[in-house]
Each structure stands twice: as structure tokens, then as C-alpha cells.
């Protein structure tokens, strides 16, 4: 019995001749190495279908092209190599290649005061494209932090002042009595509302960047905000966190401005878009602010 040739339907001519901007696969599971860590990732891989007469692309070739990422540290050079493989395997079909890598970056973070430390998760997307021989990389990073409302803090202070007047009016002030009052719920009758907040960073990298500056960008963002969420803590750390929140009262507008100024000084960034989301505990809606920056060309 003669062996039959397997049909290749994708090689047939399209019934409607029309180019497509993007064709590929989303949610491909694969391991990647970032800063020495082997992490589980999901990849979106695709190419343009510029030959409108071709019915489809060769998706298996894209899948195999991702194998180069299994043993090497994720870098702009590796991303470009993979994208070039996509194009080489689709010669005469595609002029542009695209790749998104979705990961949860794990960084070990120390406590504020005690010797404790713990792992913290940062959702990251690394996006790369090679189009008309022009290579480009973008990063999306989510950074969680705490925000305490300045207005709520002022209102709480006013209530405490009023309670002080009510409790000590026409009384001689004794240091011990005032100290005890300040440490009691009778004295501190109100506290400002705080909420867990998120900074969504979308950054365009310079062409000359050799490494993905994930950790340095996260460090710059957290330093600018001053209230990064914590991992393992003792009471001393929780107290230090309360102090940090009190010293860094922030509307969403304040957070967006802090991040804008901080990221301008981060090396390797040509432009960025910042979106901060304060999941209000006072309201059932979020407070949101956005900011853009683009380096001026010399």
C-alpha cells in the first residue's frame, strides 16, 4: 500500500485575497529565565500575513521557534533572535513578527525593620516586535502599594483635635494624662481610610538596552511611592508601615506625578505611560490617574 502525502491545507490559496495584520497563537505555556529564575510563562506569538493570496501561516513553526527561550536568559537580544526565526520560517508570507511574554516575576523583599523577608509577585508582560527590520521592546509591570487619603487624614486629625478640646477643656494638662490619652481609642477617635493600590507601568525601552531592567524599574517605582505592600512582617514592621503611610499621604494624582518624575530618571526608557488605580475604601468606585512622558529627540 502506497503511503499518502499528508495534505497541507494552509498552503492552499485563500478564497478571499486579503492580507492580515496578525495571525498566531495566544496562551502558549513555556518556561523562561529571568534574572536567574526559571519562571512559568504564557506566550502570544504571531506574524503578519502580508501575502493576501496565502490561506494561512505555519503555526507549528512559531511554536518551535519559541524553543530558544527555554535555556537562555530573557533579553532583548534573545527576543530579536526568536522574532527573526518567526520571519525566516515565513519567508514570502510575513514582514512583521510579534511576541508577548506574560509572567509573574518573584522578588524576595525584606521587611522594613525586622530581619524577615518574603516573596512578592509582580505581573509582567514583555512585548517585542520586529517589523520592517525595526526591533522594538515594551514592558508592562504592575506594582502594588498602599495609599492613604490626605483629605481623610486631615478630617481625622480635626476630629482628634475636637476630642482633645472636649476631654481637656478647663483642665490642667498633665504630661502623663496627655500621653495616655494619645495612646487610647478615646483620644484617637478617627483614622484615615487607606486602600491597596496599583501602579500600571507601560514602558518603551531604548534600542541599545542589553538587559530587561525589570527589577530596577520596580525598585524606582516603589521608592518613589514609599508605601510598597509588604510580605512577612512583625509588629515593628507594621508600625513602620503605618509611619510610611502617614508620611506619604497620596491622592491618585500625587502617585502618578511621583512615578512620572521617578521613571524619567530610570535608564533605558524612551517613553512611558503610567496609570494608577486607588481602589477606594470610602467609595464603591476607583480613583484613577494617568500620566505620559516621552524623551525629546536631540
Curated annotation (Swiss-Prot):
One Pfam family of this chain: GCHY-1
Signal peptide segment: none
Catalytic reaction list: GTP + H2O = 7,8-dihydroneopterin 3'-triphosphate + formate + H(+)
Keywords per UniProt: Hydrolase
Gene Ontology BP annotations: tetrahydrofolate biosynthetic process
Highest taxon of source: Bacteria
Root EC class: hydrolase
Keyword Cytoplasm on entry: no
EC number, as in UniProt: 3.5.4.16
Pathway(s): Cofactor biosynthesis; 7,8-dihydroneopterin triphosphate biosynthesis; 7,8-dihydroneopterin triphosphate from GTP: step 1/1
Molecular function in Gene Ontology: GTP cyclohydrolase I activity
Sites marked May be catalytically important: 149
Family from the record: Belongs to the GTP cyclohydrolase IV family.
NCBIfam families cross-referenced by the UniProt entry: PRK13674.1-1
Function: Converts GTP to 7,8-dihydroneopterin triphosphate.
HAMAP family xref list: GTP_cyclohydrol_B
Listed name of the protein: GTP cyclohydrolase FolE2
Gene encoding the protein: folE2
Amino acid at each position: 500500500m502506497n503511503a499518502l502525502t499528508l495534505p497541507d491545507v494552509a498552503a492552499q490559496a485563500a478564497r478571499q485575497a486579503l492580507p492580515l495584520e496578525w495571525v498566531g497563537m495566544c496562551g502558549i505555556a513555556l518556561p523562561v529565565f529571568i534574572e536567574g529564575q526559571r519562571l512559568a510563562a504564557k506566550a502570544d506569538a504571531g506574524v503578519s500575513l502580508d501575502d493576501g493570496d496565502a490561506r494561512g501561516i505555519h503555526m507549528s513553526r512559531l511554536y518551535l521557534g519559541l524553543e530558544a527561550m527555554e535555556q537562555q536568559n530573557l533579553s532583548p537580544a534573545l527576543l530579536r533572535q526568536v522574532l527573526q526565526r518567526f520571519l525566516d520560517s515565513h519567508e514570502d508570507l510575513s514582514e512583521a513578527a510579534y511576541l508577548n511574554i506574560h509572567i509573574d516575576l518573584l522578588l524576595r523583599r525584606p521587611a522594613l525593620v525586622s530581619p524577615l523577608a518574603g516573596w512578592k509577585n509582580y505581573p509582567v508582560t514583555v512585548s517585542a516586535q520586529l517589523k520592517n527590520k525595526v526591533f522594538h521592546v515594551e514592558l508592562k509591570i504592575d506594582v502594588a502599594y498602599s495609599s492613604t487619603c490626605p483629605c481623610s487624614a486631615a478630617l481625622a486629625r480635626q476630629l482628634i483635635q475636637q476630642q482633645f478640646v472636649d476631654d481637656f477643656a478647663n483642665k490642667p494638662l498633665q504630661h502623663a494624662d496627655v500621653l495616655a490619652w494619645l495612646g487610647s481609642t478615646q483620644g484617637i477617635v478617627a483614622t484615615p481610610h487607606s486602600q491597596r493600590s496599583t501602579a500600571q507601568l507601560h514602558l518603551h525601552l531604548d534600542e541599545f538596552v542589553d538587559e530587561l531592567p525589570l527589577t530596577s524599574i520596580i525598585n524606582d517605582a516603589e521608592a518613589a511611592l514609599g508605601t510598597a505592600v509588604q510580605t512577612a512582617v512583625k509588629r515593628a514592621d507594621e508600625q513602620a508601615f503605618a509611619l510610611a503611610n502617614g508620611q506619604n499621604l497620596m491622592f491618585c494624582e500625587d502617585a502618578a506625578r511621583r512615578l512620572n518624575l521617578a521613571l524619567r530618571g530610570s535608564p533605558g526608557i524612551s517613553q512611558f505611560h503610567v496609570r494608577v488605580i486607588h481602589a477606594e475604601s470610602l467609595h464603591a468606585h476607583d480613583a484613577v490617574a494617568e500620566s505620559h512622558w516621552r524623551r525629546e529627540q536631540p
